[in-house]
Amino acid sequence: MTSDSIPARDTKPQVSCRYAEQVLSCYAQRVDRLIERRPAKLVTIFCDGSSLGNGRDAARAAAVALLGFKGLWRAFGTYLGQATNQQAEIAAAALGLEALKEPCRVSLHTDSKYVVETMSGRYRRKTNHDWWKRLDEAAGRHQVEWRWAQGHVGHVIQEAADKAARKIAALGHVEPSVLQDAVDKIGVIEPEEADEEQLF
């Protein structure tokens, strides 16, 4: 065999697909560990539910959640239609937690002892199982501290949530201006105080 019949050697380094997959997997695991070590951000939620005509066929219910993070406040609301006051309170807590785009540490304030005591494991769940399931799923990815806030005692944020929930229930739909009014009642937030990351 002559030398010119020998195929030329490929001088490029050969890397097996298996090795490349192992390297990528290793880096992915390191990134996951770094993410796990990063402390979750602390978010404050004030929520309230309202049912006008509670317990009657013509009841009109709504839920509102006010979320605060580093000076930035946003309001979320939903019209529930025919629902009880307890169901509206559960929905309000779920609404706030569902609005978060990443796992967070959450200080959740509600004037519903029913929600606080049930989610803390002190009350048994006898009714509203579908509503509790929604709240369980919403809370599952967060570290939630359930805090009772006495209603109708002049707490600015809790009162803003309460008023917005009652207004939406009366209107029968979510009006953006109602949610904006709730945020405005909390106070003016300067742009430099707000965090640039969009958590909600």
Residue ranges and their predicted role:
Residues 24-87, 98-99, 104, 171-174, ...:
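RNase H-like nuclease fold core
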Residues 43-44, 49-57, 93-162, 169:
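RNase H catalytic domain
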Residues 88-92:
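Loop-to-helix element that buttresses phosphate recognition and phosphoryl-transfer chemistry
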Residues 172-200:
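Acidic two-metal-ion nuclease catalytic site recognized across multiple nuclease folds
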